[in-house]
């Protein structure tokens, strides 16, 4: 491999070498763009190199994907589900090396890396069952001898643009459902995790080849913003799923909507946990610790705001601070590590700038707030006491920084939870049914994910994942999210000899 090749023999198990072609187009590995390096964030050493796609490569891929869609849409949905089942089995067979690759290239700890790959496997399993349930409603017609019902058909091509923090799981949320729905998929992985894009695509491509199906049913492109912009503006792609910042997501939405396409946006989260005076404190502290520190604060569902009832404030803060001071930071592939590196050097600079902004706005660093001296991108998980009115509290700092604030009653806590532009995930710790049902009701949390007595992160695939407000409004993975990947037609059939008109209209 590259200069960081010690103990990386597992990469060969998933088809990776020192140099790799970064795009799978029309059933072939080809790319004519620049060569980029995949970097290990624990050491900032090169793992391997990848050749990116050009816009000409993209165009070739889109033409092939459009043609493949004509074949794929005619395959019965349960047969499409069988292909996705085989994809899940292929990923399952390489669960350990793929999980290690996620830990190596992204930086999350090994348990989380393996968990991420398990998530795409779970999405495959979920989608297999879904392939036999893509049914529409039968609607009573007001006209005699008429039948009215819904039919769901494929959209065509689904574009999927994923982010570095979940470099393959988010693909699974989208691609598995899109494929069983009869769509072809064009995937642009994150520019800084190209090896994951290549490795996952190799396994998917082998399944289509083994079943004598067009390779262009699944297209993968490693590249930068030019490829993403091409996907957003391409009228041949009726649906674009984008995961990233609210700032970039707004541009994607604007570009896609100008051509009357549809978007699924999974954008910034600024998630809060509320601890009431009747909470199970031990359960709350454990949950906060995982929610705020897991993945080094680089989940969209990371807890960034902690609201503590004034009567439990000191107790919770003391216990949480003690946990923070004991956390093991280091190589994510080593046993016992709980916090790996931030993904890039620029992320470390953002962390440092964030700490400076916190201090300038009156924040008090309880613990952490520093960068570790090392070759890697390691920072110390940080707890901050700060006013709820501080500007930094309204923003997402994509790092392990937790803002801690007091409240007096439930109404104030809910208002604080809802006071930020984002609306992804939220959780409350309480034992009172009245508090629980107010929290999940119309006067409670305004987020897309509303939890009770569990962390803000670690969502299951069976529910629809997504948020409100500046988080984008998208819903992916489970529940009825599949409907966004298909085209609904309302069909009315007259099986009689008369022509009664709706609303009793008599026309001639």
Swiss-Prot record:
Gene3D superfamilies (UniProt xref): Aldehyde Dehydrogenase, Chain A, domain 1, Aldehyde Dehydrogenase, Chain A, domain 2
Record's keyword annotation contains NAD: yes
Stated induction or repression of this protein's expression: By dehydration of shoots but not roots and not by heat shock or ABA.
SUPFAM superfamilies according to UniProt: ALDH-like
UniProt GO MF annotations: aldehyde dehydrogenase (NAD+) activity
Enzyme class, broadest EC rank: oxidoreductase
Pfam family, one: Aldedh
Catalytic activity of the protein: an aldehyde + NAD(+) + H2O = a carboxylate + NADH + 2 H(+)
Binding site for NAD(+): 244-249
Keywords: NAD, Oxidoreductase, Stress response
Family designation: Belongs to the aldehyde dehydrogenase family.
Stated name of the protein: Aldehyde dehydrogenase family 7 member A1
Species in which this protein is naturally found: Pisum sativum
């Amino acid at each position: 491999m590259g200069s960081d090749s010690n103990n990386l023999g597992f990469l060969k198990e998933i088809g990776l070498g020192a140099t790799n072609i970064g795009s799978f187009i029309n059933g072939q590995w080809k790319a004519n763009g620049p060569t980029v390096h995949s970097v290990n964030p624990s050491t900032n050493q090169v793992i391997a190199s990848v050749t990116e796609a050009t816009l000409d490569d993209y165009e070739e891929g889109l033409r092939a994907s459009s043609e493949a869609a004509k074949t794929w849409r005619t395959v019965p949905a349960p047969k499409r589900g069988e292909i996705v089942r085989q994809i899940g089995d292929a990923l399952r067979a390489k669960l350990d090396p793929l999980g290690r690759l996620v830990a190596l290239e992204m930086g999350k700890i090994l348990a989380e890396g393996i968990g991420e790959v398990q998530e795409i496997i779970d999405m495959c399993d979920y989608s297999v069952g879904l392939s036999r349930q893509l049914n529409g409603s039968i609607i009573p017609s007001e006209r005699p001898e008429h039948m009215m019902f819904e039919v769901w058909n494929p959209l065509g091509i689904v574009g999927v643009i994923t982010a570095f923090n979940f470099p393959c799981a988010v693909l699974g949320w989208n691609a598995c459902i899109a494929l069983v729905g009869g769509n072809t998929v064009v995937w642009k992985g994150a520019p800084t995790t190209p090896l994951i894009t290549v490795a996952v695509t190799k396994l998917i491509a082998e399944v289509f080849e083994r079943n004598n199906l067009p390779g262009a049913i699944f297209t993968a492109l490693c590249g930068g913003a030019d490829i993403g912009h091409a996907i957003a503006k391409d009228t041949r792609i009726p649906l674009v799923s984008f995961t990233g910042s609210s700032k970039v997501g707004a541009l994607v939405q604007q570009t896609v909507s100008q051509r009357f396409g549809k978007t699924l946006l999974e954008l910034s989260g600024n998630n809060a946990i509320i601890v009431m005076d009747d909470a199970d404190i031990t359960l709350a502290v454990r949950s906060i610790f995982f929610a705020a520190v897991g993945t080094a604060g680089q989940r969209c569902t990371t807890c960034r705001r902690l609201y503590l009832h004034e009567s439990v404030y000191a107790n919770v803060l003391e216990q949480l601070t003690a946990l923070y001071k004991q956390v093991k930071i280091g190589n994510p592939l080593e046993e016992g590590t709980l916090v790996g590196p931030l993904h890039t050097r620029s992320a470390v600079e953002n962390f440092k700038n964030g700490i400076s902004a916190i201090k300038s706005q009156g924040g008090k660093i309880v613990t952490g707030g520093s960068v570790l001296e090392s070759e890697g991108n390691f920072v110390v998980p940080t707890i901050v006491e700060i006013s709820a009115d501080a500007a930094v509290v309204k923003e997402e700092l994509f790092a392990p920084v937790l803002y801690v604030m007091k409240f007096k009653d439930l109404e104030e806590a809910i208002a604080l939870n809802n006071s930020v532009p984002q609306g992804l995930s939220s959780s409350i710790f309480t034992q009172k049914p009245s508090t629980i049902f107010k929290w999940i009701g119309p006067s409670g949390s305004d987020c897309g994910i509303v939890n009770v007595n569990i962390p803000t992160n670690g969502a299951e695939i069976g529910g629809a994942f997504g948020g409100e407000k500046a988080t984008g409004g998208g819903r992916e993975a489970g529940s009825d999210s599949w409907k966004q990947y298909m085209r609904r037609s309302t069909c009315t059939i007259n099986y009689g000899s008369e022509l009664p008109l709706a609303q009793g209209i008599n026309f001639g």
